[in-house]
Amino acid sequence: MRVDFNCDIYLTGSNAYLLSSELSTYLSGRYVEVKMLPLSFSEFVDFCGVEFASGGSVALAPGGEPVLFDEMFARYLKYGGMPAIASLSTTQAQHSAYMSGVYEAIAVRDIVNRERGKGKSAVTDPSLLRHVAEFLADNIGNEYSPNGIAGALTSTGSKTTNKTVSSYVGALEEAFLFYRATRYDLHGKALLKTNPKEYIVDTGFR
């Protein structure tokens, strides 16, 4: 029986659950994880068919019309780097519809339904999940605490606890929608006393 196949096998997934499940124990030491992110600004420019000269501030779009570097960067910050809508012709309506669909897929399929499938009840409220995501997206680069988020949400009528908020933030991180940044210059107990920051995976979600 042949046991050495000259082939590569690729498994793709939209969240961290695949490698945190029982499957990872069978693949231990036998796989390479490659995390795919939305387009960087330079990749976004390439996708749009625009090429700026080194240090140049103006280029020509595929249709021949001039494009300013600053306008291109502002467009990237506004619409983000999702390949499906990386185009100079993308409208605000198209962007909103697409990003809303992507978020719903992440929130419902990758988070809520997965939690239910695992028999857990930590993340069950899509509305609360959206509120937590909106809070984090609106406070990019700012320190936060689960207590602070829980207090803010409770004061607006969405009663919750810091433990629930922690579960929801963790679920958003597992779905690769947010990435946590902690202090690199602190160690030991001092690190435990600081609050982290969250950064969203794509500015288009904001």
What are these regions (language model features)?
Residues M1-L11, S24-T25:
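Conserved catalytic/switch belt of AAA+ P-loop NTPases
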Residues V3, L18, F205-R206:
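Residues immediately C-terminal
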Residues N6, D70-F73, T194-N195:
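A structure-centric signal for secondary-structure junctions around beta-strands
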Residues I9, T25, Y76-L77, E198-I200:
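Short glycine- and Lys/Arg-enriched binding-loop motifs that mark or flank ligand-binding interfaces
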Residues L11, E33-K35, R180, I200:
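Structural signal for conserved beta-strand scaffold positions within catalytic alpha/beta enzyme cores
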Residues S14-A16, S21-N142:
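Interdomain motor-coupling "hinge/lid" segment immediately C-terminal to the ATP-binding subdomain
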Residues S87, Q92-R206:
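Accessory nucleic acid-recognition modules appended to NTPase machines
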